């Protein structure tokens, strides 16, 4: 029988917030006795938006804005019921998007 694995994918706009959240998850999982692989930094997604500075004309004058999405991947190998329960109770910041796959 194959070993069970939980894959957690984190996304955030601020790299400090996502790193602290990943650290919290890793500490919680290691306390419960499961093995952790990660956090693995995935490529940062960079969206660039080009906007005309003037409200009417002057198309040559433009301004660029960028939005970076940082991503991390954490694998939990052989999770126990205690591990799953502690992950459900974990309090993480609102700026972090969490995707969990079993």
From Swiss-Prot:
* Name of the protein: Small ribosomal subunit protein uS10
InterPro entries recorded? Ribosomal_uS10 (IPR001848), Ribosomal_uS10_CS (IPR018268), Ribosomal_uS10_dom (IPR027486), Ribosomal_uS10_dom_sf (IPR036838)
Species per Swiss-Prot/TrEMBL record: Frankia alni (strain DSM 45986 / CECT 9034 / ACN14a)
Q: What does this protein do, in the record's words?
A: Involved in the binding of tRNA to the ribosomes.
Top-level lineage group: Bacteria
Q: Which GO terms describe its cellular component?
A: ribonucleoprotein complex; ribosome
Family statement drawn from the similarity comment of this UniProt entry? Belongs to the universal ribosomal protein uS10 family.
How does this protein assemble? Part of the 30S ribosomal subunit.
Record-level GO BP terms: translation
Q: Which Gene3D superfamilies match?
A: Ribosomal protein S10 domain (3.30.70.600)
GO MF terms on file?
Answer: structural constituent of ribosome; tRNA binding
Query: Mind telling me which PROSITE patterns this protein's record contains?
Result: RIBOSOMAL_S10
The UniProt keyword set, sorted, is: Ribonucleoprotein, Ribosomal protein
Which Pfam families does this UniProt record tie to the protein? Ribosomal_S10 (PF00338)
Q: NCBIfam families per the record?
A: PRK00596.1, rpsJ_bact
